[in-house]
Amino acid sequence: MLDLLPDLFDHYPSKLTLLPLAFRAFGGKRLFWGEVVTVKCFEDNSKVKEVLAQPGHGKVLIVDGGGSSRRALLGDLIAQSAMDNGWQGVIINGYVRDAARLSSFNLGVYALGAMPMKTEKLDQGQINVPIELGCVTVKPGMMVYVDENGIAISEESLNFAFLN
């Protein structure tokens, strides 16, 4: 079941929206899904760290970092915290660091690219607010489905029973 999205789009074409940004896979987990939690921030990952330090069983954090390539919003330490707290994955409209290490983690990590510089910690940003990614509105509580074909969101949890 590595190609989930083609089957979901075939079965639920009107219930899914594809995120149009060119995300790259960095984590070791390439297939994941879960309830959306959002963070909106710019070159400050304080809120990303705060959210991923909380229990996230069955959830995926989607971060709108404004697409900035000047600072990495996720590295190995925060990703380790996410794994330890049961998060399914992290999707970032921005950049990550520690790319080689992230590839060994059992965590879904998708971002626009990698760069080595960390952020400042100014405790700025917003948690669980609607965000815009490539003209698509992503709201907390939505569902996200990810595989190597792309990233799609839905207003509701989709049943996979038809795959059997």
Curated annotation (Swiss-Prot):
Keywords: Lyase, Metal-binding. One of its GO terms (molecular function) is metal ion binding. Its EC number is 4.1.3.17, 4.1.1.112. Its cofactor is a divalent metal cation. It comes from the Bacteria. One of its GO terms (biological process) is regulation of RNA metabolic process. CDD domains: RraA_family. Divalent metal cation. PANTHER family: 4-HYDROXY-4-METHYL-2-OXOGLUTARATE ALDOLASE 3-RELATED. Catalyzes the aldol cleavage of 4-hydroxy-4-methyl-2-oxoglutarate (HMG) into 2 molecules of pyruvate. Also contains a secondary oxaloacetate (OAA) decarboxylase activity due to the common pyruvate enolate transition state formed following C-C bond cleavage in the retro-aldol and decarboxylation reactions. This is Putative 4-hydroxy-4-methyl-2-oxoglutarate aldolase. It comes from Shewanella oneidensis (strain ATCC 700550 / JCM 31522 / CIP 106686 / LMG 19005 / NCIMB 14063 / MR-1).
